[in-house]
């Protein structure tokens, strides 16, 4: 007669319980709210779109046209702010502006070398904007269709002062990077929907010119070279006045980032995040989301190894079941959550993408520790 020891019962119960907790404590179970498909008012307010460029002639040639071909019932302007030394880009913009009344371009002087040129470009673009509502984006992005502006601006009304849009990475981008971007969106966009916006990694942000000018733009963050979208949301988001637009017609498509651009974005975040407020609750939530899946994985593997060593086949079966339960549940939950945003990410790779996050984060921290910290400051202050 087979007897089941107390150790087997307790260890088996613990690993199964941890597998359940490790599956349910999950950012992909905290769903995002999607806007009702019913359209709001047919009319729209005039709006300005700001694109900041630096050595982005190729991207502008491929992406700018779609910004200029939006079907929009009111006037809109696309302001491209480049640098005075970028002669080829200025020549291209001059030709395009002659053909399209929506396009306006300007540049920052070469002498602006002791402050963040990116933030100076944005500030100059805001001052040049004719309209109250402004959408800020990048030359490496393009609208998914000609309804982008119309769909994005349905939120540009009272009581909103900030609108966060979604940006999908081009399908040529590595699956793990597309996964990481979507996972961050579940934290950051949901946070903006529920309370205060914390930051955004997606360059599709609408804000009010009057707010930006009244609060002196990037004052408080000028010492950092980048972090312009993070700080914009962190400074200007208030409780209840931030909208999130997830309709696929409002998406922007981001060109495949180079390895350098991808890693630099993480390095600049490491440098500038210390200036962001409202970070504690986000960090605590993310820590819990990492702790329980990894604790469950380690417990299941350790129990499985122990059970095999002790030839406790009942416990071996329970530990194996707990391990499979954890991996299958997390994979199914992640796949169901992200398929709205990207249905091309392999379901078989999802467990590796999820459990690789802490190692990718560690690699980013090591790169930052080894980097020259002066590279992240403008030396202005």
Task: Mark where each language-model region is.
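Short aromatic/hydrophobic "clamp" motif used to bind/position activated sugar donors
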Residues: 122, 134
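Acidic donor-binding segment of Leloir-type glycosyltransferases
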Residues: 65-112
């Amino acid at each position: 007669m087979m007897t089941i020891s107390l150790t087997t019962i307790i260890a088996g119960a613990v690993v199964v319980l941890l597998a359940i907790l490790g599956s349910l404590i999950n950012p992909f179970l905290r769903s995002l709210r999607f806007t009702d498909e019913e359209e709001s008012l047919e009319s729209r307010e005039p709006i300005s779109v700001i694109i900041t460029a630096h050595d982005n002639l190729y991207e502008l040639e491929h992406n700018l046209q779609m910004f200029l071909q939006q079907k929009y019932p009111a006037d809109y302007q696309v302001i491209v702010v480049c640098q005075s030394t970028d002669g080829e880009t200025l020549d291209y913009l001059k030709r395009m502006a002659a053909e399209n009344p929506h396009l306006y371009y300007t540049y920052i002087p070469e002498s602006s070398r002791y402050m963040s040129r990116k933030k100076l470009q944005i500030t100059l673009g805001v001052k040049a904007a004719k309209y109250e509502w402004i959408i800020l984006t990048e030359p490496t992005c393009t609208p998914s269709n000609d309804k982008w502006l119309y769909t994005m601006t349905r939120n540009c009304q009272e009581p909103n002062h900030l609108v966060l849009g979604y940006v999908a990475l081009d399908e040529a981008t590595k699956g793990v990077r597309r996964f990481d971007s979507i996972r961050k969106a579940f934290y950051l966009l949901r946070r903006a929907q529920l309370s205060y916006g914390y930051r955004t990694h997606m360059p599709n942000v609408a804000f009010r010119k009057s707010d930006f000018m009244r609060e002196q733009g990037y004052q408080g963050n000028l010492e950092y070279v980048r972090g312009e979208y993070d700080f914009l949301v962190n400074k200007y988001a208030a409780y209840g006045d931030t909208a999130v637009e997830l309709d696929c017609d409002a998406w922007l498509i981001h060109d495949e980032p180079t390895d350098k651009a991808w890693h630099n974005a993480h390095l600049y975040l490491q440098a500038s995040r210390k200036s962001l407020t409202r970070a504690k609750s986000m960090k605590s939530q993310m820590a819990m989301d990492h702790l329980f899946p990894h604790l469950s994985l380690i417990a299941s593997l350790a129990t499985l190894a122990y059970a095999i060593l002790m030839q406790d086949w009942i416990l071996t079966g329970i530990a194996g079941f707990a391990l499979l339960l954890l991996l299958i549940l997390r994979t199914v939950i992640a796949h169901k959550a992200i398929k709205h945003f990207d249905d091309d990410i392999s379901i078989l790779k999802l467990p590796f993408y999820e459990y690789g996050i802490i190692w990718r984060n560690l690699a980013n921290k090591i790169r930052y520790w080894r980097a020259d910290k002066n590279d992240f400051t403008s030396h202005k202050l």
